[in-house]
From Swiss-Prot:
Enzyme class: ligase
Taxonomy of the source species: Bacteria, Pseudomonadati, Pseudomonadota, Gammaproteobacteria, Lysobacterales
UniProt family annotation: Belongs to the NAPRTase family.
Gene Ontology BP, a term: NAD biosynthetic process via the salvage pathway
Protein name: Nicotinate phosphoribosyltransferase
Pathway info: Cofactor biosynthesis; NAD(+) biosynthesis; nicotinate D-ribonucleotide from nicotinate: step 1/1
Function, as annotated: Catalyzes the synthesis of beta-nicotinate D-ribonucleotide from nicotinate and 5-phospho-D-ribose 1-phosphate at the expense of ATP.
Disulphide-bonded residues: none
One Pfam family of this chain: NAPRTase_N
Catalytic activity: nicotinate + 5-phospho-alpha-D-ribose 1-diphosphate + ATP + H2O = nicotinate beta-D-ribonucleotide + ADP + phosphate + diphosphate
Amino acid sequence: MIIHSLLDTDLYKFTMMQAVLHQHPAAQVDYRFKCRTPGVDLAQFIDEISREIDALCRLRLREDEVDYLRSLRFIKPDFADFLALFHLDRKYLTLAASAAHPGEIELTIRGPWLHTILFEVPLLAIINEVWFRNTSEPDFEEGRSRLREKVRSLRSMPAGCKIADYGTRRRYSRQWHGELLPLLRDGLGEQFVGTSNVFFAKQYGLTPLGTMAHEYLQAFQALGPRLRDSQVAALDSWAREYRGDLGIALSDVVGLDAFLRDFDLYFCKLFDGMRHDSGDPFEWGERVIAHLEAHRVDPRTKVLVFSDGLNIDKVMRLYEHFSPRCRLAFGVGTSLTNDLGPTPLQIVIKMVRCNGQPVAKLSDSPGKSMCEDLGYLRYLRDVFGLPPMPEAGDPARQ
């Protein structure tokens, strides 16, 4: 059994889930799985994946786990009570081998947002671990050696250069994830600020980290009053839920240009900072700093969070570039939790519909966008003033 606890997920799944419970408990959503790594035959392991999903759906939170969530200042009593009764229901999930694309799997989640939001991260962790335990021999000593070198590199930086673990969804295995976190904690001291994984935060006395994911802002494309106002509606909703807590806004759901147009003086003052998850991080940071300064907000009072495909070298370069002009945070994922030699899988589960309407992410990085409805993509780009989609046959179209 790969997943032993419903806490073995990212914190932002719980923080978004709480907002859904309080504000949109009736919302219905669709998610789709996609493997971006070519030539990966996951279909051969579909029975093993299915058994792991069955085990996941039998899990409930233990009393001590619910008590841990209650201890977090932003978790409200009614949500903790709800989680004490919660379990994932297999009826909302379909898994089959793809008839159109041999070797691929078709994984769909469809149902109430409140009851399906916790599927994504453990499903990705399951698929990763099933793949790697069947296709590679783990070289944990090589992984430990690489980890020690990363610790040495980071220790050579100023004490303000700090990282967090964001690697649950693409980890090599649960065992390796559990081993590396205390190594980072003990090796880096205050330069290791915590983990997005709630289970391991509880187990190792680490700070659980996270705010919102793309799906939260995507859903408001169907939940908000107007499509053009969907980002503003999502950020307002978040502010109502958390009243100044968990104040990191995600900037790339419909691209940085559109985000900055919506992130006005009110949001610049209200939120603690912004998170980068696609596009050139150096260009992004410069534009965010300039945006804050244009609104007479001192960037040194705000946090820029970087979380897109980071490794330790990139962390150090970003820190040297932006410090001390702003506060900095770095969430490192695959480079920490899946660096034992085998090539990591590029797999995602993304929301594609909400209340029967298509929703989409228009990433600042080519290839990271995902939507089933090309007509909606064209409309979304037009509404937010983005360049038209490339014509059929243009490599950029893919």
